UniProtKB/Swiss-Prot annotation:
Annotated organism of origin: Escherichia coli (strain 55989 / EAEC)
Family the UniProt entry places it in: Belongs to the NtaA/SnaA/DszA monooxygenase family. RutA subfamily.
Protein name, UniProt field: Pyrimidine monooxygenase RutA
Annotated binding of FMN, by residue: I68, K69, N134, E143, R159, Y160, S209
Keywords (A to Z) from UniProt: Flavoprotein, FMN, Monooxygenase, NADP, Oxidoreductase
InterPro entries assigned: Luciferase-like_dom (IPR011251), Luciferase-like_sf (IPR036661), Pyrimidine_monooxygenase_RutA (IPR019914), SsuD_RutA_monooxygenase (IPR050172)
GO BP term (any one): nitrogen utilization
């Protein structure tokens, strides 16, 4: 493993920066985000995700997000071949939590916007106003070809035009309960949705291409991006700067939320040993599938999420930023994340979710300057 060269020093600039939000990226697919025969092997279940999100709520995580995946990568680990569905999972989790924000992901090629608008309004009712929607255009062609709904490869270059119309229909229906939108992709004829959400519905996205960031700048409440490298917590800063600049063009404030995997232990050496063990068990067959799919989109440029996911540097965990170290080291690196202009939060995954969240809440978070505002824990977690 190649760590960053000297550790960056930083100064948290103001009270706002001392309050970075933390979310958990729940394992809706088997084995979470480690494509390795040496990683924990498990199936996704409601009970597992309920335990994860209830622990996250106990430790004052701000939000939980689930992705949507409709076809996996295969290989020895059958990576992501087994997946729950995002909206129904998050509806269930909304009913068994009370404070944490809940986000489901809409694969927009599979669901008409009027149906998503109604499902979101329903989960808003279940959660008491704690629900939001992550919109994805879809990049893995076999997910949609298997159902006969892939619109053709021209979609790669038009997908944000499609998503722009999609979100306009959503905003109409959530805002007024009615839409007569007419576009290239959608035609609404006195379309109605009621009841409407009790609070303004948050829309999030994960654009890293120029087109994706332009969409987020115009329509999203915040934008997810990948962290980069191993123990290089501020390497994503140019991406956050691009998002900040794009948002300035629209006169909106759209912060970046950064995806990281945490692999922590008592010492740096113990954590590093875990990471090396996971890398040694990389499922090469599944990784080959990911690489193959990343090459299908020849029209969206070189800065898309899927291109980063398939980079061989750290493909074993789809090249999300990886923080490997002692509890104190991980806390320090997360504070460095908080120092980056435009970074408003992080979305965390763990090599082992249940023990990872507990360790984070008990051993890492109390050391973080950017979480010093949290109240003391007062109850037992289930």
């Amino acid at each position: 493993m190649q760590d960053a060269a000297p550790r960056l020093t930083f100064t948290l600039r103001d009270e706002e920066r001392l309050m970075m939000k933390i979310g958990v990226f729940v394992p809706i697919g088997n084995n979470g985000w480690l494509i390795s025969t040496h990683a924990p092997q498990y199936m996704p279940t409601f009970e597992l995700n309920k335990a994860i999100v209830q622990k996250a709520e106990h430790y004052h995580f701000d939000f939980a997000l689930s992705m949507i995946k409709l076809r996996g990568f295969g290989g020895k680990t059958e990576f992501w071949d087994h997946n729950l569905e995002s909206f129904t999972l998050m509806a269930g989790l909304a009913a068994v939590t009370s404070r944490i924000q809940i986000y489901a992901t809409a694969a927009t090629l599979t669901l008409p916007p009027a149906i998503v608008a109604r499902m979101a309004a329903t989960i808003d009712s279940i959660s008491g106003g704690r629900f939001g929607v992550n919109l994805v255009t879809g990049w893995q062609k076999p997910e949609y070809e298997q159902m006969g709904i892939w619109p053709g490869d021209d979609y790669f270059s038009r997908r944000y035009d499609y998503l722009t119309e999609y979100v306009q229909v959503l905003r109409d229906l959530w805002g007024t309960g009615k839409s007569d939108f007419k576009g290239d992709f959608f035609t609404m004829n006195d379309c109605r949705v009621s009841p409407q959400p009790s609070v303004p519905m948050k829309v999030i996205c994960a654009g890293q291409s120029d087109a994706g960031m332009a969409f987020s700048a115009q329509y999203a409440d915040f934008n997810f991006c990948f962290g980069k490298g191993v123990n290089t917590p501020t390497a994503f800063a140019p991406t956050a700067a691009r998002m900040k600049q794009a948002a300035e063009q629209t006169g909106r404030d759209v912060g970046s939320y950064v995806l990281f995997m945490v692999i922590a232990d008592e010492t740096d050496d113990a954590a590093r040993a875990k990471w090396e063990h996971y890398k040694a068990g990389a499922d090469e067959e599944a990784l080959s599938w990911l690489t193959e799919q990343s090459q299908k989109d020849t029209r969206s440029g070189t800065d898309t999420n899927v291109r980063q996911m398939a980079d061989p540097t750290s493909a074993v965990n789809i090249n999300m930023g990886t923080l490997v170290g002692s509890y104190a080291s991980v806390a320090r690196m997360l504070d460095e994340v908080a120092s980056v202009p435009g970074a408003e939060g992080v979305l965390l995954t763990f090599d082992d979710f249940l023990s990872g969240i507990e360790t984070f809440g008990e051993r890492i978070q109390p050391l973080m300057q950017c979480r010093a505002h949290l109240p003391a824990l007062t109850q037992e977690v289930a």
